[in-house]
Every structure is written in C-alpha cells, then in structure tokens.
Amino acid sequence: MKIVRIETFPLFHRLEKPYGDANGFKRYRTCYLIRIITESGIDGWGECVDWLPALHVGFTKRIIPFLLGKQAGSRLSLVRTIQKWHQRAASAVSMALTEIAAKAADCSVCELWGGRYREEIPVYASFQSYSDSPQWISRSVSNVEAQLKKGFEQIKVKIGGTSFKEDVRHINALQHTAGSSITMILDANQSYDAAAAFKWERYFSEWTNIGWLEEPLPFDQPQDYAMLRSRLSVPVAGGENMKGPAQYVPLLSQRCLDIIQPDVMHVNGIDEFRDCLQLARYFGVRASAHAYDGSLSRLYALFAQACLPPWSKMKNDHIEPIEWDVMENPFTDLVSLQPSKGMVHIPKGKGIGTEINMEIVNRYKWDGSAY
C-alpha cells in the first residue's frame, strides 16, 4: 500500500466570547486534519493541534515529501522518524495510518486492536469555566445547567485561575445547581503549590461528589504530588502533556497519581497512547484520556478505552470516562458522534466507522492570516 497523496486541512474559528482556565483565555480554536491516500484508494484521517503556520510548513516542506512513496503498512517506523521532527504531527500520521491498516484488513480500528470489551464509554462534560465578565460565575452555572439538561452525569470545571475564595464560591454555586448526584471534577491546570492545593481538602469532606482533583501542582514537584495524594480524600489525576509512557514511569513509581490522563495528540502517536493506558493497568491506577483539543483524537481515545481491560469489578463503574468538550467549538462536530445520557456508543464500521464532516472542513478553512 504505497502512499501516493496527502491532503491537509488547517481549520480556524474565532470565538464569539473568550473562555478559559488558569492558563488564560482562549479566543480561537484550531484544528489540523490530514488525509493520507494509498495507491489502492484506501485512505485514513489524522488530526493534530499546534500553531497552524508551523504545522502547515512542517507538513508541506518535510513530512509530506518524506511520506510520499512509502508503504502505509510501515506505521511504526514512519511515525518514529516523524517524532524527531514534530511529535504532534507524528500523532496525526499515526492515526491516519492506523485507519488505513484497519480498512485494508476490512475491519474497524477496534477489531484491528483485538476487539472491544464494551460497546459504549462514559464521557464527562468539560468546561472552560472562566470568562472576561464580572458575572463569570453565573455564566458558568448557566453553561453547566444547559449540559446537565442534555443528560451528562459527570462534569469537569476549572479552578486555580482566580482567588481561592472566589473559586470556592463558584464551586458552591455549581454544587447547588448540579446536586450531589452529579460527579464533579476540579481541574487546577498546575496552578497551586502543595499548601494551596491542600486547602481544598476542607471542602472535599463536604462535597461527596468530587471525581478527582486534576493537576493541582507543576509536575516538577513529584514529591509534593506524592505527599498531597497521601493526604487528600479524593483521587489525584494528571499528565495530559506527557509525551509517552517513559514520562509516566517516575510519577507512577513514586505513587504521585491515582489517574493518568494521556492525550492522543500530545504523545508520540496512537500506539504510544495505548501503551500509556496499559502502563496504568500494570501499575494499578486508572486512566482517563485528556481529549479536549480534537474530535478525531477523542474518537481514537474512545476506541482505545473500549479495548482497555476494566480497572475494577464494580458494576457500572469498571471503565473510566473520557473528556467531552462542550464549549463553543465547531470542530467538536467534525465526527458525528453525540453522547446520550453521558454515554457514547462506539462506531462499528470499517476504519473509524464514520465520516469526517466536510461541510465543517470547508467552512472553517484557515485563510493563512495571522491570529
């Protein structure tokens, strides 16, 4: 299966109203899709995220010339080479070549990987809680209310981007709105030191629905992570920016995390992403993929979760949820899956089992201008 053509689709959307987390406000969303076509006509799609000008030059000047004429079945060696040039671009190539392999074998991605354990995966609604409005708390509450009406039973909201007192006021308002039956995840985006993070423990004794505390500290403080984890009454999660299994090993060896959160687009390809999930199982911790930045990468995270052995024997709580972006973002609909009552059914067709929405691709093509 010789690669004969590669198409690229840089996409851009400027937000109507900025939203954000402890790292600041997002004012736009981007997506970079690729489509690899073989001489037999079999194709596969991939996705990555980064600054669009850098991605586009990287693909057109180096990655595409390198891939043309290569065998699509040589996924591991091709991806390993591209990793040296641009790790996130390598992730897109790995997705596309995985879909080609599945289609060539006349099966789904999950079947290519040995089959799924389950037909549906739980997802949680992921919010960017902060906005540049004095009424940001009420706006956040309204956003959460809207998604709860759609059937989500788990939500993730942001902390660490304003004063501790104001964050507590925000979470109390959400608790009043959502109720204790809704699982709530708190994501600090590495905003605190250990002392500041531990202040939340007082409230965890009151809020019985906290799913986990996400990335409370920078990851250059593993000893503080281990200490904090030992003292908190809720699980500690993190690791969305780790580049592969090797970066998780010291954190897991030191028992820093209860839940690891690899991202398909941040690691060195889909194969290493799956290695991260399996590594968690070997260490006896949970794995819940970070999947905020793309719908195709989220689909691959769902595939991987469907093929992952259960973490527990507890009925209806044996597999970890996957992140689902519910903020303004047209690229969420590039893949036509939608949750129902907080669950997503896994497509069963050949390859990824669904089509990329070309209407969205054509509508949001980046025009090459600065942003």
From Swiss-Prot:
Q: Which GO terms describe its molecular function?
A: hydro-lyase activity; isomerase activity; magnesium ion binding
- Cofactor needs: Mg(2+)
What does the record list as GO biological process? carbohydrate catabolic process
Question: Per its UniProt record, what Pfam families does this chain match?
Answer: MR_MLE_C (PF13378), MR_MLE_N (PF02746)
Write down the EC number.
5.-.-.-
Q: What class of enzyme is it?
A: isomerase
Domain of life the protein comes from:
Bacteria
Instruction: Note how many cofactor molecules are bound and how.
Output: Divalent metal cations. Mg(2+).
Do you know which PANTHER family this protein is assigned to? ENOLASE SUPERFAMILY, MANDELATE RACEMASE, MITOCHONDRIAL ENOLASE SUPERFAMILY MEMBER 1
Can you say what this protein is called?
A: Putative isomerase YitF
Q: Which organism is it from?
A: Bacillus subtilis (strain 168)
Q: Which gene encodes it?
A: yitF
